[in-house]
């Protein structure tokens, strides 16, 4: 007959209904009187145990069995389990020492789970392997076969705060015999009093319920932990309406509080005396552990957690400090501590304040959706912040002010409703290897005499700029990757003077580095590339030093000086820009030294609109247009530059341009080494102009020049060409050994288009043919006049730079000296003007 079960283990039991076979002898161990002794009992995983065979009266002679006297051998496992279900923990441990079978059954996890939940209420085992360490586990994933029993052992000697249960417990001593090590109290204050009177060792379990207005001042190393089913901290709520909910005082060095909700909920939420009241108050010379707590304060005048004073050094971990009506966590007055893996969100003021030499270590906290700043360090506050996720705060993610000096490492600071990091009023700090992105304002903002270190960060995809340094700001900006920002990657203004080095500033929707309003700074060894506007702007009285940078592949200008922008540009590589490598305009007067400027789709250096500048010892080559353009009343100084292998001219001076050109080497350029036009008047001294593929120097369109001590040699078209009406001042020039291809072509009767094609402009006598109805924009070389237009009504135009339209095939009659027409030259009449930057349109 099958026994009917009603006790624990009746459902889904691993033990099948069966009787034991008779054994010749049994194994037993001495009975222990405590849980410590029970820990040595033999335990096995019974879920996979082989099923015992039923005992048949026909197959065994029961009267002859040597173990007949042991009735328990004949009981089914389920019956034994039913009996064991009425035992308490110490009796179970004693039963486990009787024999191997009892050891197996008395260690049944279901028995221990029932006992465990009856005492501690946890629906998952709470492990306590060492002082100050508690954590819950999933039983199925734990390596020990009976985690319920193991946790019971670890938590056994403790006091329980369980309102209403103490009277029942002490009124039924027989029912709870063996639980003398457990104490029960109705209030937390009573339990703390029991610790002071040494009734127990200081482990307090606070069971489910709301505990209001208790006086919880902790002056000893007690351990207080919530005990409840499900999510423990939601079920154990301790609140105060008049005073700080928990106060840790000297003597509580190793105290532990965990797995509960701690609230400060005053009736008058704005009363001024509450500014000294908090959910948690941790004072001098104590280092408690606060673990897995939910912390809430509705008070508008005091922080939720306040850690203050020398020697205050708590560990606060896995806590949720949210929805508070003031500051979440406040660390001040030389306090320290370790704060790890906390959730800090939706607080009315800063998520964290650090002030007055507070110096915490804050790791892996999630600080978000604050109604103010995320982290605020000020008044000499410090701290080490590592691997925190700081985002979606209403003001900056991280603010540093008034001599504060935090270290922020490998954090993510993003999606701020204003900026990412804000350092002001003499703030300092080290910001290292962080990701700063998608903030509405600047990723990093440094102002008002602040001097932080910004190293190794990724600053990207901001809705404004990357790093802004304003208002006498300083700082070291080093080794950062700054990209994809809507405005300038770095902006320096109003007397600020940072050091900017080893950064990559690229792919911005605006410019790379913008220095304006008397900005300064040392900008060296950066790579600035692929920005939509200028790689570097310098304007409005600014004087930065740019040294050893690589500025390249921009969609406009490389470096742009305008509106009295000054400074030093030296030892840089500036290349492959869609516009000029360098532009100087409107009173700007930089010193440009020892740079390599090449590969531009426009000119190398463009000086225009009254620009100045001292341009010395540069190498300017392989630009699509002139190596240097000087225009519109500009007056730079060029010394000792090498300007070569340009796809247009070497130096072009137009529209009233002036300048001093001294000791430059100008060679191997496709057009004239120096072209001077349209009322310009430069001074050229001691230059060498040679090996050009066109003329050495050409002067035209009412321009003049002073030429002293120049050497002009081995140029293809010739050395010096002066258009009609041009007068120059010349002294001690050497014009020698030029190839004179123009004169040779004329003397051989060739059309000059033969040597120029439509890409060059040889200077010689040019004419117009009235018979062929040529326009004012057509010109015919002297040999075509003699041969192709012989007998026509012709008119001498002037000695100047043209190419022959007859030889180009653009006239009605074919040229008899040249080949087939190759190109329409009506619109190709002079060197193409450089493209001027439209950067200002985007300011």
From Swiss-Prot:
UniProt keyword terms in alphabetical order: Chromosome, Metal-binding, Nucleus, Repeat, Ubl conjugation pathway, Zinc, Zinc-finger
Domain F-box: 69-115
Protein name per the record: F-box only protein 11
Gene Ontology CC: chromosome; cytoplasm; nucleus
Region (Disordered) location: 1-63
Polar residues: bias regions: 30-45
UBR-type ZnF: 749-820
Protein's gene: Fbxo11
GO BP terms: negative regulation of calcium ion transmembrane transport via high voltage-gated calcium channel; negative regulation of epithelial to mesenchymal transition; positive regulation of protein catabolic process; proteasome-mediated ubiquitin-dependent protein catabolic process; protein modification process; protein ubiquitination; regulation of apoptotic process; sensory perception of sound
Localization per record: Nucleus; Chromosome
PbH1 repeats: 311-333, 334-356, 357-379, 380-402, 403-425, 426-448, 449-471, 472-494, 495-517, 518-540, 541-563, 564-586, 587-609, 610-632, 633-655, 656-678, 679-701, 702-724, 725-746
